[in-house]
Amino acid sequence: MNMKNIIKNKQKELMQGMIALILCMALFCSAAVSGENDGSGWKMRHDGQKYEKTGTDGQVQIPLYAGILAEFRTNEMKILADNQEILAKAAERAAEEAAHPEQGVYTFLQGPKSWTEGRAWSGEWSNQYVRGNYFGNFGCGLCCMANIYCTLTEYTCSPWDMYEYARQVSGYAPSRKIGAIGWADMKVTLRKSGFDCTLNTKPESYEEFQQEIAASQMAVVLVSSRDDDTYWKKTGGHYVSISLYDASSDRVFLGDPADPDGNRSWISLRYVYDALKTVSQYQYLLVQDYAEEQNQWMHDGITDAWGGM
């Protein structure tokens, strides 16, 4: 199942649960109390039959729970009526998210300029200083990894959280000269976070690349303008994340940590294929699946200051 279907299924389950809750409340209240009042008291229904009990004075006796259920029904119906607008807006929001699954995809930015400008998806991690290098200069791969973790699990983390975890569980050791995380350390870190992922080289045919991307949930790709500068300019090597492959338009949803203007845009998958950095040992990492029981990290929450979604 690809990531687009996962997001749609989550939204569908949410809506079904909301509708089921409303119907159950209404049906329970309707079944519990008949709503008839003959002037002398409430009549209860039992197995579809009216039930009433008369006292020695011939008056209909009101069972204790009849009043409780009647009051419960009145209160619940009032709650439903009072929240009708909220429920309607929630339904509209769910429908909007189903029509635009990219709203559930995380796309963090790495640079300090974006953070200074108050851009959405930017954060204070950009100014973290590591062994003579700022995160904003090398954090593209870690942003992509955080995108995957936040999008495909029920948890969240910041790119800096991902940096710290990669340092802990892999051989990742950034330096002044080389700060970017390598393919092997990326794969190890994601595997320990519960992801089934593979490292891949550029296939001979574009059609094969299309099939691989379509079958994956998300991907991290390494692009370079030296291979093709149709989309990326003056880029020696840069990690970006792609997801939600649309076969009808042959486009993917782009998470570009270094480009606040191009981030969260739909681009031709062909641009990605042509720009794959061929001098690298690998060109892209495919995320095939996520297994909660394999997640050794279970990190949840972003404590860094950031611009939000």
Predicted segment positions?
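Noncatalytic regulatory segments and standalone regulatory/sensor domains
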Residues: 106, 113, 245-309
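Active-site-adjacent structural segments surrounding the nucleophilic cysteine of cysteine proteases
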Residues: 35-177, 298-300, 306-309
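Stable alpha-helical elements in mature extracytoplasmic
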Residues: 136, 141-148, 158, 162, ...
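Mid-length scaffold segments of soluble, non-membrane domains
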Residues: 168-201
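Gram-positive cell-envelope targeting signals
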Residues: 1-37, 45
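Structured segments of extracytoplasmic/periplasmic soluble domains
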Residues: 143, 147-155, 165-169, 189-196, ...
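Active-site-adjacent substructure of cysteine-protease-like catalytic cores
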Residues: 201-259, 296
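A short local loop/turn or secondary-structure capping micro-motif enriched for an aromatic residue
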Residues: 62, 229, 261-264
